[in-house]
Regions:
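Acyl-donor-binding surface of acyltransferase catalytic domains
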Residues: 43, 54-156
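Ligand-binding loop in jelly-roll beta-barrel domains
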Residues: 224, 246-247
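Conserved acetyl-CoA-binding loop-helix of GNAT-fold acetyltransferases
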Residues: 81-95, 229-246
Length: 247
């Protein structure tokens, strides 16, 4: 069985096929943001397997700033098929991956085992892996609509603000391991995606904030130490969820 590359002109038409949650959430979400123009600077390629009735999908997000992302999802429970899918799809963009210093794969552990096997088989230069187990959470449309109707209250003396590229430096100061290229990455995300902050009115300082990662997931939440235990983090996260859903 062969893999195939989705032509860019077909990205819009393939979206309904990918709207299977949570199985294809990362692939669908990334492509949807790209099609709508609500994503940081990048190029995206999408692959499927097999050609007849595809059940295995990969989105390769080549970021202008920062490492590329490989997002993998499947609607099949047949783990015996995973290896065939990986070994059919990855050669279609393996040369691009080889040219990168690093890349991030988002997928199930059962699939990642075959990704690791492929990379070893194809002799990737200086290849090593670092697994970071995560749990993914999402809300269905009914719960999103409910959230839109939920009032979000801040303590006295605080107010919501929208963040943009001009706030990148403040956000970067909370990232102790940031590299020199991360500033451009953060600015690109703030320019294209919703981002929320809470400001302390008296001092004008940003007290808490959250913005989206390169795939549109909310994952960068921070409250400055002097403003913690006031409920600002929960308020920021709810407001960002509202903004993401509206956009």
């Amino acid at each position: 069985m062969a893999a195939f590359r989705v032509a860019p002109k077909d990205y819009c038409s393939v979206l309904p096929t990918l709207k299977v949650f949570p199985d294809l959430l990362s692939v669908y979400g990334t492509l949807k943001l790209f099609v709508d123009g609500n994503i940081d600077d990048c190029k995206i390629e999408v692959f499927g397997f097999p050609e007849e009735k595809p059940v295995f999908w990969v989105a390769y997000k080549e970021n202008t700033f920062g490492k590329p992302f490989v997002l993998i999802g499947t609607t099949s429970d047949e783990e015996s098929m995973y290896k065939n899918a990986i070994f059919a799809i990855f050669p279609l963009f393996a040369e691009s991956l080889k040219s990168k210093e690093s890349f991030e794969v988002v997928t199930l552990k059962a699939i990642m085992d075959h990704v690791r096997s492929f990379l070893q088989t194809f002799d990737f230069p200086l290849f090593t892996t670092l697994d970071e187990p995560n749990s993914m959470f999402y809300m269905n449309e009914q719960n999103c609509e409910k959230l839109l109707q939920t009032p979000i209250n801040l303590p006295d003396g605080f107010e919501f603000i929208s963040l943009d590229e001009n706030d990148a430096q403040v956000l970067m100061e909370t990232m102790p391991y940031a590299s020199h290229t991360d500033m451009s990455m953060v600015k690109s995300r703030l320019a294209a995606m919703p981002a929320v902050g809470v400001r302390h009115v008296e001092t004008g300082k940003i007290a808490a904030f959250e913005y989206n990662d390169g795939c549109g997931f909310i994952s960068h939440l921070y409250t400055f130490p002097e403003y913690r235990r006031l409920g600002l983090g929960a308020a920021v996260e709810k407001r960002l969820c509202q903004m993401n859903y509206k956009k």
